[in-house]
Amino acid sequence: KEPKTIIIDYGGPNVAKPLHVGHLRSAIIGESIKRIGRFVGHKVIGDVHLGDWGLQMGLIITELKDRKPELPYFDESFTGEYPEEAPFTISELEEIYPCASGKSKEDEAYRNEALEATHLLQQGKPGYMALWNHIMNVSVTDLKRNYDKLNVSFDLWKKESDAQPYIPGMVE
């Protein structure tokens, strides 16, 4: 038979959140299928498919704004270059998200602020996009380190946000 090109979407972690046992299962099964497919002669492409474009981003942005309102990302009149270094570590991110998620379940105003931050991010607000880039860089670096420990690798690091340019045309 002629070799096929097969794309496997496995992994599926959300950025800024730690991996859990469900991600481990998906990673091991997906990596095994990828290797078997390659062993029998197919071109198999592994895609991690990151969750990076939903409410968790708005929650993180909102919590950062509450904790560090002095950051330039939240200054509407800021016109300079945003800092190259992230204003948080992976450990801080892993603490910020559950804190923000808990607040959003108890405080409707906070949840609405996070929903608005998500919307503004998806509309391309510069300060929020800069924060999103920091979140992505810090998270993906940590994810790659963790997947390397599992001997799991991906050919593609596609993410939810990659679909953003196609959404307006699909909605119309």
Short names for language-model regions:
Residues 1-172:
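NTP-dependent nucleotidyl-transfer catalytic core
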